[in-house]
Amino acid sequence: MGGEGGAEPVIHFVFVHGASHGAWCWYKLTTLLDAAGFKSTSVDLTGAGISLIDSNIVFDSDQYNRPLFSLLSDLPPHHKVILVGHSIGGGSVTEALCKFTDKISMAIYLAASMVQPGSIPSPHLSNIHVGEEDIWEYTYGEGTDKPPTGVLMKPEFIRHYYYSQSPLEDVTLSSKLLRPAPMRAFQDLDKLPPNPEAEKVPRVYIKTAKDNLFDSVRQDLLVENWPPSQLYVLEDSDHSAFFSVPTTLFAYLLRAVSFLQR
């Protein structure tokens, strides 16, 4: 956000994808926002989407989040954005919140990891994105005698865990575009030091009630441990609200940001 010469500032949303996804997953939502006169930007993190970097050589969260950090650092003076993070992309949002506090007017977590900087995540959240079945396949970029460097959901589980309420066309699209996520990038996402200034930025949590990957109990625990200023529930959404309920999600985003203008 931010304007020149007294002009009304244009609200600017920046979207951060979750594991294996990319900027492409926000296409429905950004279309709605752009048509309504807002500005939207979707970021491909390192090794995701159309990034040319192999996720197996992404070593930490700083490298993974570099495209997001570059975008924020290049914003004009006094220009602020609303960050929206999905799934484990919530960790990227929180890290950006700590590093670029003065560039962010609101942080929105969509079925996302939301851990307070300086806190220790609850043991109940240790398997936050893992189902009971063996739903993941791993890549070993440094050899099978070393820890895995990448992870991707097995094709037969994609619809159930990611897109159970989403249109089949979006499931088909996603199955062609998902990429292995860099495991090492996620190891330090929730290990940020305390940051009192970041705590002052309004946060919003949007729950997904029919989520087979990130269940309501875990989402509720995140909200309880670090209460946001606003909480919304998408009753008919699977893990990927940008596909299953884009118009409702659009309405909730507008409702959330309306509080900034009061």
Swiss-Prot record:
Could you name the Gene Ontology cellular component terms for this entry? cytoplasm
Family membership: Belongs to the AB hydrolase superfamily. Methylesterase family.
Q: What is the effect of changing S87A?
A: No esterase activity on methyl indole-3-acetic acid (MeIAA)
PANTHER family (UniProt xref): METHYLESTERASE FAMILY MEMBER, PFDCC METHYLESTERASE MES16
Q: Which InterPro entries match?
A: AB_hydrolase_1, AB_hydrolase_fold, MES/HNL
GO BP annotations of the record are: chlorophyll a catabolic process; chlorophyll catabolic process; leaf senescence; oxylipin biosynthetic process
> What PROSITE patterns does this protein's entry cite?
LIPASE_SER
Keywords, in A-Z order? Chlorophyll catabolism, Cytoplasm, Hydrolase
From the UniProt record, which GO molecular function terms apply? hydrolase activity, acting on ester bonds; methyl indole-3-acetate esterase activity; methyl jasmonate esterase activity; pheophorbidase activity; primary fluorescent dioxobilin-type chlorophyll catabolite methylesterase activity; protein homodimerization activity
Q: What is this protein called?
A: pFDCC methylesterase MES16
Subcellular localization, as worded in the UniProt entry: Cytoplasm
TM segments? none
Pathway participation = Plant hormone biosynthesis; Lipid metabolism; oxylipin biosynthesis; Porphyrin-containing compound metabolism; chlorophyll degradation
What is this enzyme's class at the first EC digit? Answer: hydrolase
Name its species.
Answer: Arabidopsis thaliana
Entry EC number(s) = 3.1.1.-
Q: What does this protein do?
A: Involved in the chlorophyll breakdown by its action in fluorescent chlorophyll catabolites (FCCs) demethylation. Demethylates the C13(2)-carboxymethyl group present at the isocyclic ring of chlorophyll. Uses primary fluorescent dioxobilin-type chlorophyll catabolite (pFDCC) as substrate to produce O13(4)-desmethyl pFDCC. Also able to catalyze pheophorbides in vitro. Methylesterase shown to have carboxylesterase activity, methyl indole-3-acetic acid (MeIAA) esterase activity and methyl jasmonate (MeJA) esterase activity in vitro.
The effect of disrupting this gene, in the record's words, is:
Accumulation of fluorescent chlorophyll catabolites (FCC) during senescence. No effect on root length when grown in presence of exogenous MeIAA.
Q: Which Pfam families match?
A: Abhydrolase_6
Catalytic activity entry: methyl (indol-3-yl)acetate + H2O = (indol-3-yl)acetate + methanol + H(+); methyl (-)-jasmonate + H2O = jasmonate + methanol + H(+); primary fluorescent dioxobilin-type chlorophyll catabolite + H2O = O13(4)-desmethyl pFDCC + methanol + H(+)
Which residues does the entry assign to the active site, renumbered to this chain? S87 (acyl-ester intermediate), D211 (charge relay system), H239 (charge relay system)
